[in-house]
Amino acid sequence: DKLFLSTNNVEASKLLFNIWDIWSIADNQETQILFDEANQFMDVGELDNAIELFSKVVEQSPEFAEGWNKRATVYFLKGELNKSISDIEKTLYLEPRHFGALDGLAEIYLMKDDLVGAAATYRRILEIIPSSKKSQDRLRLINDLLV
């Protein structure tokens, strides 16, 4: 709610970082260790290893939204967009205000030339983060193209 009310970009950025930190905490130590290792694999481009570990994360802790979101990100990086969308949908089911998952979904819509889907998704992001310059700019560009 503070994020929605924030009009100051610095304050909004701090809130975003805090939210990401909270989202990245698993419900148990074993899942957290797997999650952290999977992130390390993702960071160095070992995407297959990252998927393997993120899959274990979501098997162990299926209610851990960030596990699904991170696996969606790796699928996106591999170009497996339908698998990414599936994991994004699961992320959003668990955490409907997951602006990161929404941003990834909007990018996929753009890659698929689905401007209507992208516009709707950027509007959803702006409902969560009204000060999101990226979402405002992208929505403006899409609306110009749709006219």
Which positions does each model-derived feature cover?
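Long, contiguous interaction/recruitment modules in multidomain scaffold/adaptor proteins
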Residues: 1-27
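TPR/TPR-like (Sel1-like) alpha-helical repeat modules
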Residues: 1-7, 113-144
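Short helix-adjacent coil turns
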Residues: 7-10, 45, 79, 113
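Conserved positions within tetratricopeptide repeat
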Residues: 13-16, 32, 51, 85, ...
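Alpha-helical adaptor scaffolds
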Residues: 28-100
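Register position in tetratricopeptide repeats
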Residues: 43, 77, 111, 128, ...
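Residue-level signature of tetratricopeptide-repeat
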Residues: 71-72, 78, 105, 112, ...
